[in-house]
Amino acid sequence: MCAPQQQAGATTGAAARPPAATERRTVLKVAGAGGLALTFSTALGAGSPAYAAGNRDRRRAYVLVVDGCRPDEIDSGLMPNLAALRADGRHFPRAHSLPVMETLPNHVMMMTGVRPDRGGVPANEIYDRGLGETRTMDRPRDIRTTTVIERLGRRGFRTGTVLSKDYLYGVFGERATHRWEPFPLLPVTDHAPDVFTMEAALGMVEELDPHLVFVNLGDVDRVGHSDLTGGSLQALRRAALASTDLQVGRFVEMLRSTGRWKRSIVVVLADHSMDWSRPDRVVSLTSPLAADPLLAGNVAVAQNGGADLLYWTGPAKQRDRGVARMLEVARGTAGVLSAHDRARSSWLRLGPDAGDVVAYCRAGWRFSDPMVVSNPIPGNHGHPATRPIPFFVGGGHPAAAKAVSSSLAATVDVAPTIAEFFGLRGAPRGGWDGRSRI
């Protein structure tokens, strides 16, 4: 689940977040393409003509994340701009999201090029053992490695983030040269509509001209969390797809009209897809775990829509027994697809912040913890059913030459792709977990 529904006792990092302007940053105000006044937080001195001229490399890279988009939706006839961009670029039809198939971990993987066991942020929601409560992983320090944003910045390249969701703005913090604070934020969804996000992206590119701009478009995801069993809500989903495609079309047209197209790549992907459940297809593990004599009072649950993360909080000497029992209870609960001992399932690559047991629900189901009513959202992700994503590299630069590949591209491939495009030498300590797709 990526709608920001806090669980009981949950906290976010918003209170600790630095303000838009600090001693290291200043505020720039520019006029957007549609006449909207735009405000960007910019690294101190980065708005000066001298700074803008400091790196004269003419290559440009733009990463557009169509949050929550399913691959088949680009073929629906509602997204002609994205379909054309895909048809003329490098297309990876077998691309996939990575565990946990949620917004925060997959955006972080895009910009770090490493899996959560190395880079942090395994899920949207975790149980923070230090705090003793569940929280959102939206703090800048939750990312525990260097992003490609920072790697570019250290070599004199200008970077920018235009992220529609409040928690994405939070976790990436002040890493970029220029960043836009999402505004206006809609109540409940905590995201800025795509029309405002795209105005900010257009304004940032035209006025500040970063070498790399990382954009999240959140409308498709936010509408996707609604129940699609009714005709009116199906219409909302279709309208969101068409509207987001229109915004992408505006961006491509701007690149062409300003002469940037031929020296640019445009990486388009989703962070996850979407799955829908009926009101009666709900899994809540809190009650069966609490009903077990060994587990009662000794387990914390972090609910992530299509995945539950379970944490043993009891005596350390009983941990092995506790984990074995958690696995047994989870696997015996209707609607659960699978449950895994996180420490013994090396392929998950999630790290200790993801707890002791990772449980996935079946397609057409959702988790809701701590209570059955805690997650009323029918549209969810995080489980294997939401693994397929669109992934393609468009643009006028030769690196985006038309091709179709059967390779298993993934969200973690974005950072090494950007690094190769700009000729960055070296890789994170331990190497990339992803690989370049150009």
Spans of model-derived segments:
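Active-site-proximal alpha/beta segments of enzymes that process anionic O-linked groups
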Residues: 68-208, 310, 433-437
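N-terminal secretory signal peptides
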Residues: 1-22
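Acidic/histidine-rich catalytic neighborhood
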Residues: 274-309
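Metal-dependent active-site segment of extracytoplasmic phospho-/sulfohydrolases and closely related
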Residues: 62-63, 81, 243-285, 351, ...
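Active-site neighborhoods of enzymes that stabilize oxyanions during catalysis
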Residues: 302-417
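N-terminal twin-arginine translocation
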Residues: 19-29, 35-54
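Active-site-proximal N-terminal segment of extracellular/periplasmic enzymes that hydrolyze or transfer
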Residues: 35, 40-41, 51-90
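Active-site His/acidic residue clusters
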Residues: 166-184, 197-250, 282
